[in-house]
Amino acid sequence: MSSTEPSDQLAVGLTQVARYRAFPETAGGFTLPNAQSSDRHIFFSLPGAIAVPAVIYWRTRRFGKPAFSIRINDFTATQYTFVDGDEAERTWHEIIPATTNAGPTLRPDNNELTFFARDGSLVFGDVVILYTSNQTTIPLHA
């Protein structure tokens, strides 16, 4: 007699893979404020993004004591004002929550990343978002 009986239950697995989105338009850095504006908006997609906490990374180089903020859709990732003791160059990271009151923080499409700076000059660069996707492959667009 066997102590193992066949299961009547079917297990269903959900695909979840770690992905990253590097922003090539930030590789050389961009300065805010500039002659045109004190903010910069980047619109982007994250194929298969699901409502799981994510991470954003970026670097800054400051001139003076600027204040800045970074928003991702309805979430303010960072608000900071530099002081005299702060280093001129710095790398940053922030956790992006899975959801806000408006719904998922990151979406597969129609995301907006907003950089703002005032009271000095700040170079932002090398922006990367790590996120969780439900797609194992992503189509390449020519």
Where are these regions (language model features)?
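Beta-strand-rich recognition domains
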Residues: 1-142
